[in-house]
C-alpha cells in the first residue's frame, strides 16, 4: 500500500509542476500523472546518478517537490475539479490496488524470472546495499543498461531503510494506471470535441471503453506479476505515441497548448529511454517525421519551419541530453552492455557468420516474427488494424506513422543484435522473440483501439446516434452501460486481487520451485550459521541435470550488510550441475568426478534440488545415511566437525533443528 501511495504521490506531484495542456474538454489528470512519472525517473537519474546526491536525500527531495506540486495546484485550482477527480481512473484504479493490498493482508514480492534476480531487482538490491549507484557503477552486471528501472524499484525502500520487494511491486502498477488515465482523458476529449457528447455521458462512455480496453489486456494485466522492464517499457512507449496523437488534435491556433504537449512528450520519451535503450529508436523517426512535410501532413497543417523545429527541440532535446550524459558517464566496449558499439562492425565487416549462415538466419528470424504476429492475440490485432486502416483512409495519422517507423527500426535492431551481440546459441535458436515482439504489438494494440474509438465516434455522430443516446441516457444507455461497467469493473477488481495475491505467494503462477528452495535455504542457513556451521558457510546446490539458475537465486538471497555496514554474501554458493552437457558425459570424465567430489567434501551445507543416482552414490561415500538418501530431495545435509573429524548430518529441509 505504501508503494502505491509513494509512486502515485510523487508522480502526480511532479506532474502538477508542469504547465497545463489547456485545451477545451481535455482533463490534464492522466497527462500530468504520466509525465510526472517520467519526471521522477529523470529526476532520480540526474540528481542521484549524475549529481551523486545520496539515495535517502534524493527520495526526500523528490517527495518535497511532489508536495510543492500539490500545493501549487491547490492554490491555482482550489477544489474546482474535485468531483471529476473523484471518479477519475487515476483515483479509482489506485484505490482498487490499495483495497486489494489491504484485503490480502499486505503485499510481498517473490521474484519470478532469472532476469529479475540477475538484472532488475538483483541490481536494485546491490545499489541499495552499497548506498548508491556510483558504488557499483563499474562492477554492475550489464553496465551499459540505462539505470532508470533499477533505480525506480528501490526508491520506496529508502523510506524505512529496508529492502521490501512488495513496495517495488507497485512501480509498474502505478505507471500503468497513469497511462490508462491518459487514455481515458483522450477518450473523453474525443467524445466531447468530435462527438459533441455532453460531459456526463462522455465520462460514462469513456469508462466503458477503458474497462473494455483493460478487459482485453491491451497493455497486459493492470497489475503486472513481474518486475521485468518490458511492461514499463510498453507503458512509457505507449505514452509517447499518445502524446503525439494528442498533439495532432490540438489546432495551430492553440500553439501554447501544443508546445506544452510537446514538453510532456519530450519528458516521457526521455524517461522511456532511461527505462530501456530501445526508446532511442524514436529519435531518427521523430526527426524525419518533423522535417519531411510529405510524411507529417496534416500534423503540421502550416508548413512553417518554426513549428517543426519547435517540435524537434521540445521532444528530442530531453532524450538527447539523457543519451549524451549516459554515454559520457558510462562508456562501454561491450556490445551487450552498449548496443551502439556494434555499429563499428558496419565499418570493418568483421562478422562471425558467413553470408549463407546470415541468409538462413534471416529466413528463420522473419518466419518467427510472422508466426508470432499471426498468433499473439490475433483478434485484438485484427480489431486494432481495422481501426488503423479506417483512420488512414481519412488522413495520415502522425502517431501511427511514428509507430511504423519505430517498428521497422526495432525489428532491424533485433536482427542486428542476433548477428553481433547475443552469441552463437541465440543465433541458432533466436533470443526470446516472443518477449521482444510483445512490445511493438501491444503498442499497436493500444493505438489501434484508440483510433477505432475515434472512427466509431465519427460514425455515431454522422448517423445521429449520439443524439439518440443522449435522449435515452436515463433509460437504455444507463442500464446497459451500467451493467457493462459493473461487470468489467468487477472483473478488474478480481484480476488486481489475483495479481496482489500472486506476487506475494505465486499461488497462480507455474513458478520455478528452485526460487522458493533457495529462499528457504537462505532462511535455513541464517538459523544455524555461526553456531553449527561457520559464519560464512559454503553452500553446495545439487541440481543434476537442471541448469544453473538456482545459483543466481541463492546469490540474490545471500546478499546482506554486516554490523560494520559492509556488503557481503551471507554464504558462498557452489553448484553441481552438468548443464548444458549431458551428465553422463561428465561422469565419464575423471577430472569432473574429482571436481564434484571435492565440492561435496568442502560443503558446509548441501542442498539437494534434483539428484541422480551417481550423485547419491557420491553422497553415500561421504557417510550420509541410507534413510537420508532415500528421501534426499526432502532433506538438507549439514557438515559437522567433531573431535577434528568431519561428518555429515541429515536434517529436514524446512524444519532446521535447534
Show which residues each predicted segment covers.
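Membrane-embedded, hydrophobic transmembrane alpha-helices
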Residues: 1-85
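Hydrophobic, aromatic-rich transmembrane alpha-helices
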Residues: 10-20, 75, 176-193, 374-404
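Perimembrane helix-loop-helix junctions
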Residues: 73-77, 282-316, 393, 564-570
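Active-site lumenal/periplasmic loops and adjacent helix-entry segments of GT-C-fold
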Residues: 99-203, 221
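Membrane-lumen/periplasm interface segments of specific transmembrane helices
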Residues: 109, 292-296, 306-388
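Membrane-embedded, lumen/periplasm-facing catalytic core of multi-pass transferases
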Residues: 486-558, 653
Amino acid at each position: 500500500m505504501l508503494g502505491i501511495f509513494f509512486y502515485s504521490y510523487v508522480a502526480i506531484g511532479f506532474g502538477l509542476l508542469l504547465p497545463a495542456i489547456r485545451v477545451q474538454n481535455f482533463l490534464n489528470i492522466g497527462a500530468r500523472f504520466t509525465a510526472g512519472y517520467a519526471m521522477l525517473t529523470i529526476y532520480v537519474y540526474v540528481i542521484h546518478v549524475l549529481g551523486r546526491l545520496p539515495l535517502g536525500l534524493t527520495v526526500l527531495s523528490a517527495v518535497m517537490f511532489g508536495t510543492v506540486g500539490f500545493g501549487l495546484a491547490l492554490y491555482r485550482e482550489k477544489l474546482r475539479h474535485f468531483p471529476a477527480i473523484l471518479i477519475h481512473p487515476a483515483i479509482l484504479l489506485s484505490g482498487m490496488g490499495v483495497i486489494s493490498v489491504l484485503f490480502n493482508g499486505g503485499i510481498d514480492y517473490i521474484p519470478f524470472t532469472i532476469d529479475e534476480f540477475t538484472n532488475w531487482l538483483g541490481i536494485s538490491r546491490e545499489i541499495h546495499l552499497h548506498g548508491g549507484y556510483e558504488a557499483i557503477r563499474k562492477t554492475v552486471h550489464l553496465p551499459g543498461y540505462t539505470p532508470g528501472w533499477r533505480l525506480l524499484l528501490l526508491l520506496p525502500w529508502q523510506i524505512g531503510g529496508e529492502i521490501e520487494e512488495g513496495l517495488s511491486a507497485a512501480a509498474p502498477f502505478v505507471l500503468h494506471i497513469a497511462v490508462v488515465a491518459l487514455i481515458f482523458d483522450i477518450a473523453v476529449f474525443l467524445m466531447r470535441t468530435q462527438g459533441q457528447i455532453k460531459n456526463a455521458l462522455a465520462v460514462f462512455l469513456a469508462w466503458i471503453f477503458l474497462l473494455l480496453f483493460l478487459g482485453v489486456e491491451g497493455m497486459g494485466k493492470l497489475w503486472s506479476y513481474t518486475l521485468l522492464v518490458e511492461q514499463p517499457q510498453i507503458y512509457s512507449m505507449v505514452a509517447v505515441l499518445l502524446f503525439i496523437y494528442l498533439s495532432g488534435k490540438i489546432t495551430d491556433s492553440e500553439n501554447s497548448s501544443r508546445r506544452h504537449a510537446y514538453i510532456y512528450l519530450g519528458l516521457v520519451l526521455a524517461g522511456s529511454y532511461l527505462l530501456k535503450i530501445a526508446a532511442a529508436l524514436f529519435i531518427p523517426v521523430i526527426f524525419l517525421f518533423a522535417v519531411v512535410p510529405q510524411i507529417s501532413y496534416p500534423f503540421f497543417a502550416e508548413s512553417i519551419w518554426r513549428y517543426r523545429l519547435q517540435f524537434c527541440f521540445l521532444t528530442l532535446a530531453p532524450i538527447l541530453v539523457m543519451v549524451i550524459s549516459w554515454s559520457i558517464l558510462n562508456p562501454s566496449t561491450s556490445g551487450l552492455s552498449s548496443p551502439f558499439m556494434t555499429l563499428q562492425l558496419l565499418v570493418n565487416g568483421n562478422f562471425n557468420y558467413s553470408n549463407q549462415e546470415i541468409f538462413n538466419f534471416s529466413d528463420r528470424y522473419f518466419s518467427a516474427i510472422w508466426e508470432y504476429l499471426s498468433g499473439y492475440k490475433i483478434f485484438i490485432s485484427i480489431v486494432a488494424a481495422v481501426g488503423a486502416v479506417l483512420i488512414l483512409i481519412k488522413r495520415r495519422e502522425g502517431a501511427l506513422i511514428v509507430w511504423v517507423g519505430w517498428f521497422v527500426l526495432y525489428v532491424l535492431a533485433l536482427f542486428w543484435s542476433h548477428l553481433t551481440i547475443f552469441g552463437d546459441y541465440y543465433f541458432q535458436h533466436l533470443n526470446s522473440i516472443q518477449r521482444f515482439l510483445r512490445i511493438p504489438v501491444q503498442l499497436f494494440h493500444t493505438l489501434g483501439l484508440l483510433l477505432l474509438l475515434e472512427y466509431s465516434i465519427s460514425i455515431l455522430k454522422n448517423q445521429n446516434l449520439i443524439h439518440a443516446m443522449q435522449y435515452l441516457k436515463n433509460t437504455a444507455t444507463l442500464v446497459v452501460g451500467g451493467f457493462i461497467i459493473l461487470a468489467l469493473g468487477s472483473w478488474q477488481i478480481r484480476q488486481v486481487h489475483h495479481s496482489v495475491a500472486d506476487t506475494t505467494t505465486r499461488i497462480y503462477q507455474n513458478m520455478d520451485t528452485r526460487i522458493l528452495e533457495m529462499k528457504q535455504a537462505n532462511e535455513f542457513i541464517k538459523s544455524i550459521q555461526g553456531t553449527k556451521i561457520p559464519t560464512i558457510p559454503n553452500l553446495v546446490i545439487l541440481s543434476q541435470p537442471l541448469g544453473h539458475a538456482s545459483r543466481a537465486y541463492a546469490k540474490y538471497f545471500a546478499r546482506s550488510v554486516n554490523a560494520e555496514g559492509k556488503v557481503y554474501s551471507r554464504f558462498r554458493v557452489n553448484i553441481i550441475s552438468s548443464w548444458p552437457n549431458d551428465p553422463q558425459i561428465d561422469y565419464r570424465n575423471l577430472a569432473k568426478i574429482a571436481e564434484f567430489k571435492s565440492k561435496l567434501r568442502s560443503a558446509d551445507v548441501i542442498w539437494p534440488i534434483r539428484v541422480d543416482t551417481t550423485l547419491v552414490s557420491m553422497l553415500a561415500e561421504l557417510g550420509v545415511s541410507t534413510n537420508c538418501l532415500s528421501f534426499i530431495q526432502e532433506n538438507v545435509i549439514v557438515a559437522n566437525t567433531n573431535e577434528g573429524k568431519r561428518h555429515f548430518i541429515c536434517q529436514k529441509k524446512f524444519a532446521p533443528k535447534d
